[in-house]
A protein has these predicted regions:
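Bacterial N-terminal signal peptides that target proteins for export
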Residues: 1-8
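Bacterial signal peptide processing site
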Residues: 20-22
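Flexible, solvent-exposed loop/hinge segments and secondary-structure transition points
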Residues: 25-258
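C-terminal motif of bacterial Sec signal peptides marking the signal peptidase cleavage site
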Residues: 16-18
């Protein structure tokens, strides 16, 4: 009996070998083919680390004039993701991290994720430009409910490490998030939070420029205000004490005048 079973087993192995390339046993043929083109950016080597991010954040309010807002961009959180959406760095501009808005930590992460996730190599998309598109009656209504923030990335008001290396996600559709580029290749996203969304955008813009990571030769992703620039599907609401490029543009419309 043992001899019979041994013979049957040998026959099965020989038959299996004959179904593939000569002399091989076929395994896992149902697996999909792998892409021959690797990701154009891996890891966090193409974006600022925490040591570089903090001075970029601290120096931004003094560059290119007043940034406006409630605190002139001086109490802020910043987050950076890589091209793959993984969180690479967190920074806070104040020495006491808890002196900033605690809620801004998660918002900064989500802004970085959104800017990276909605931009491509040929077309940057700031979170500010998603504002009108994501309102009721517009084509991206509901987008803010997509890609919820990964709870494994949540941290306290002084936590600068939780979430690093993870895809944190989150979707924010107001100012403060910008995609990062090396030439014409998207390498990640930057998110800033801690003031009005208009000032958040201004601080992020200054940081990206100072880091040399602004897109080259592409359509603008700067913030647009209908009250100043005219109607646009990419328009953002005015904020209290709104500045752009160091020039005051106006204030947010009071609620009783809507």
């Amino acid at each position: 009996m043992r001899a019979v079973l041994s013979g049957l087993l040998s026959g099965l192995l020989i038959a299996a070998a004959g179904c593939g390339r000569p002399g091989t046993i076929v395994r896992n043929e149902s697996q999909p083919p792998q892409s021959s083109t690797p990701p154009r950016s891996r890891g966090c080597e193409d974006v600022p680390d925490a040591a570089a991010l903090k001075p970029l954040l601290q120096n931004a309010p003094s560059q290119n004039g007043d940034a406006g807002g409630l605190n002139h961009g001086k109490a802020m959180w910043a987050a950076v993701t890589n091209r793959n959406g993984e969180l690479c760095a967190l920074a806070v501009s104040t020495e006491d991290a808890a002196a900033t808005w605690p809620g801004s930590r998660g918002i900064a992460i989500a802004k970085a994720s959104t800017a990276n996730g909605f931009s491509i190599d040929t077309a940057p998309m700031s979170t500010a430009r998603l504002y009108t598109l994501s309102q009721p009656g517009h084509s991206l209504w509901g987008a803010a409910n997509g890609n919820p923030l990964n709870p494994l990335c949540a941290g306290s008001a002084v936590d600068l490490t939780t979430g690093l290396g993870k895809v944190c996600g989150g979707t924010i559709t107001f100012g403060g998030g910008l995609a990062l580029y090396k030439g014409q290749t998207r390498v990640g996203g930057l998110g800033v939070s801690g003031d009005t969304s208009c000032t958040d955008h201004e601080i992020a813009k200054r940081m990206r420029e100072a880091a040399g990571l602004a897109p080259a030769g592409m359509p603008s992703d700067d913030i647009v205000y209908a009250a100043v620039d005219g109607p646009s599907p990419f328009a953002h609401a005015m904020c209290q004490n709104t500045y752009r490029d160091g020039k005051k543009l106006g204030d947010e419309t009071p609620a009783d005048k809507d």
